Amino acid sequence: MFGSATANPPAQRDLPSSDSDSPTPDAQPPYLLEISHISKGFPGVIALNDVQLRVRPGSVLALMGENGAGKSTLMKIIAGIYQPDSGEIRLRGKPIRFETPLSALQAGIAMIHQELNLMPFMSIAENIWIGREQLNGLHMVDHREMHRCTTELLERLRIRLDPEDLVGNLSIAERQMVEIAKAVSYNSDVLIMDEPTSAITETEVAHLFSIINDLRAQGKGIIYITHKMNEVFEIADEVAVFRDGAYIGLQRAESMDGDSLITMMVGRELTQLFPEREKPPGEVLLSVSNLCLNGIFKDVSFDLRAGEILGIAGLMGSGRTNVAETLFGITPSDSGEVRFDGTTVHIADPHQAIELGFALLTEDRKLTGLFPCLSVMENMEMAVLANYAGNGFVQQKALRALCEDMCKKLRVKTPSLEQCIDTLSGGNQQKALLARWLMTNPRLLILDEPTRGIDVGAKAEIYRLISLLASEGMAVIMISSELPEVLGMSDRVMVMHEGEMMGILDRGEATQEKVMHLASGHKVH
């Protein structure tokens, strides 16, 4: 019965069988979870090589590493999705092996995936208790009891949602909370959170962290996977680092700083994360005057020079992405003027924008960028395919040569151009999408969250490419939610708040405090 899962903790769980004896009742193991000498290989790849990890009760362990470091593989082993080739897992001091994700859940290990696994046309209560529904005396689902238990669970977590709300009507952050509630409903002692803040606002992050603090106080062990170093130092007690399938080390978060963490992750010092550009910007290439999209943003005005990087900062919902989509013709403006290279232009659709020399790398590469079932080459050639086709034939040899050249220039790591792009790391996917647009020879490059969900080493590569393109005379608009990124890369920073342009700061005067002040709706005096 699921009712007891929320009100009173159940009796000691029956763990999957193990050949080893359990610890004595009086012995309290110091760790909730211990990983020892785990190895895992796939055809042609050693994903994990003799790694270790341990999670203390009542603590948050941040798991850091570049994409491909082995973090996800280890978490899938812990959650029962993969089986290790060798090594041992101990839960509460007892050796254990999970054959299925269900056996891991029943033992007290829950994983909240980055790609949320909820049913959009079912209610919150139905999603939380799916497969564990309470039945009444007629052996029918007892919706009243399910509602009661869900209400109690949400109140305990301070999540203000109606159990009867359809999940499909919730925001991403609210769905994240439902996933956490579902994990807690199993009385899980170990919770694995994979990039939980990748698509939520700062206010929602604060709420998430308060819930994590509550879970920590209840003695839960939390494994927190993230690429955001500021979150590590805010929420984590300890930090474990993986690199190239190997365990590098574990340290107290308070004993580390950003530089030492980066060095552990990439195996070298990134002395200059944001490259310097000596060449000054050229003449004005793009001039935007009083651009408006009814109900979304109004009176946006700015100039952009060739070779200049203009950062756009603001909180989620401020209108940053909408401005980019309007410039690219996805949502044509209702009023205002756009001049490109001295000529007034009316951009009605993306095809016209591309012909003018505009390129847009969208905010969500999985939703609006990638064709996940197609190859690297098929994804890269998408924007120029029409230029290499005629009379029913495609110039495959010329396209392949172009794609190979772009892969070399942008350092896209892939076994072959025929490789399914969905198998590449986030950083290499992003570079492949950037290559798609560079093949069109754009003069204006609009980047919306160009480093979202990629590791620090791949970020350095993206920054290098953006800086190189600007040095070659390309005008760049870069939208980002990461203030250090905006401040480190931009020549000027435009700040938006609820559809209004609050101001533009030169590089020398732009600080995190000033940008946040403007982004919150306050003018800088």
UniProtKB/Swiss-Prot annotation:
It catalyses: D-ribose(out) + ATP + H2O = D-ribose(in) + ADP + phosphate + H(+); D-galactose(out) + ATP + H2O = D-galactose(in) + ADP + phosphate + H(+). SUPFAM superfamilies: P-loop containing nucleoside triphosphate hydrolases. Residues 14-25 have a biased composition (Low complexity). Residues 33-269, 279-523 form the ABC transporter domain. It is a peripheral membrane protein. Residues 1-30 are annotated as: Disordered. Gene3D superfamilies: P-loop containing nucleotide triphosphate hydrolases (3.40.50.300). Keywords: ATP-binding, Cell inner membrane, Cell membrane, Membrane, Nucleotide-binding, Repeat, Sugar transport, Translocase, Transport. ATP binds at G65, E66, N67, G68, A69, G70, K71, S72. Pfam families: ABC_tran. It is found in: Cell inner membrane. One of its GO terms (molecular function) is ATP hydrolysis activity. Its EC number is 7.5.2.11, 7.5.2.7. GO terms for cellular component: plasma membrane. The keyword Transport applies. Its main location: membrane. PANTHER family: CARBOHYDRATE TRANSPORT ATP-BINDING PROTEIN MG119-RELATED, GALACTOSE_METHYL GALACTOSIDE IMPORT ATP-BINDING PROTEIN MGLA. Belongs to the ABC transporter superfamily. Carbohydrate importer 2 (CUT2) (TC 3.A.1.2) family. Part of an ABC transporter complex involved in carbohydrate import. Could be involved in ribose, galactose and/or methyl galactoside import. Responsible for energy coupling to the transport system. This is Putative ribose/galactose/methyl galactoside import ATP-binding protein. It comes from Pseudomonas savastanoi pv. phaseolicola (strain 1448A / Race 6).
